[in-house]
């Protein structure tokens, strides 16, 4: 985030956005209630890189800005890497509808970010070593399956991995309500 108000940070996504559009984007990004709690609301000045906001709040303001921008291609680089579990859930809930209908490239160590990707690429030491859907990669029993086991079944959701970076690309398609 830039050293300016939350409003101006959001308007970088769409300079001519109306107050109603700002509200809709903030609600979609799960940050509206927090902004409303601030003494100056959208006119609250945030410091360089958003020092007055938590990591999750900064991410959600950035997501609201992207919602306003409405890009055809979305690139997420470690979107939930430094967040606690609660903030991660809020950010992921905001990302799901944002990713629908557009190409999304997500770079992540936390596999929860990419489970529903159409295609997952696993990189190790600078090379793509696996490619497939979540189910396919689990069946193969390679690096991805080991990371999944470590992060989910082993209860180490915040595990730091040394095997490589996981990248996912594709559109997220909602298959039910929720």
Name every feature range the model reports, one short phrase each.
Residues 170-178:
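Long, low-complexity, intrinsically disordered segments
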Residues 1, 33-34:
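Short beta-strands and strand-coil junctions in structured, solvent-facing domains, enriched
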Residues 1-2, 42, 144, 148:
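Conserved hydrophobic/aromatic "anchor" residues
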Residues 35, 77, 146-147:
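A generic structural-conservation signal
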């Amino acid at each position: 985030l830039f050293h300016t108000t939350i409003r101006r940070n959001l308007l970088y996504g769409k300079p001519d956005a109306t107050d109603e559009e700002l509200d809709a984007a903030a609600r979609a990004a799960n940050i509206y209630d927090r902004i409303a709690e601030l003494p100056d609301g959208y006119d609250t000045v945030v410091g360089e890189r958003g020092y007055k906001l938590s990591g999750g709040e900064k991410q959600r303001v950035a997501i609201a800005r992207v919602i306003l921008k409405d890009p055809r291609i979305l690139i997420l680089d470690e979107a939930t890497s430094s967040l606690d579990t609660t903030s991660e859930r809020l950010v992921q809930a905001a990302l799901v509808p944002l990713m629908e209908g557009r190409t999304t490239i997500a770079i992540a160590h936390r596999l929860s970010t990419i489970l529903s990707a159409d295609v997952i690429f696993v990189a190790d030491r600078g090379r793509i070593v696996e490619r497939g859907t979540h189910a396919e990669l689990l069946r193969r029993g390679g690096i991805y399956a080991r990371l999944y086991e470590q992060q989910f079944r082993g209860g180490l959701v915040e595990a730091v991995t040394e095997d490589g970076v996981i990248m996912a690309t594709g559109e997220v398609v909602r298959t039910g309500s929720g």
